[in-house]
Amino acid sequence: MATIIVPMEMKMNLKREQEFVSQYHFDARNFEWENENGAPETKVDVNFQLLQHDQENQVTSLVVVLSFMIVFDRFVISGTISQVNHVEGRIVDQASDFNQEEVETLARPCLDMLNRLTYEVTEIA
């Protein structure tokens, strides 16, 4: 397991595990089907799933889950990418405990993976 330590504020450090791509779909758009059933819409969601609180060591483990459907002119990509993160020095009870900058920092590796996969797939498609 590769671990990357990211300082996030004076009171918190972040250890990350490797990103995991559980689903990644590339589909050509079917405009005939869309005319009958409706066009897909772009949607990107970032959610957090709490795994564990370690009160003694002040570590919260959570999974960042990026779910997406992104509509382009000729194709649609969709899927799910996740990553386990260990927040050191802070107990987190819910996603709202993070400020916007922290949410963006937590989500960044999954978004970077999405960008990389999309670039590589669309380059050859």
Role assignments for model-derived ranges:
Residues 2-108, 123-124:
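N-terminal intrinsically disordered, cationic/polar leader segments
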Residues 110-111, 115-118:
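Helix-rich interaction surfaces within compact, conserved domain-sized segments
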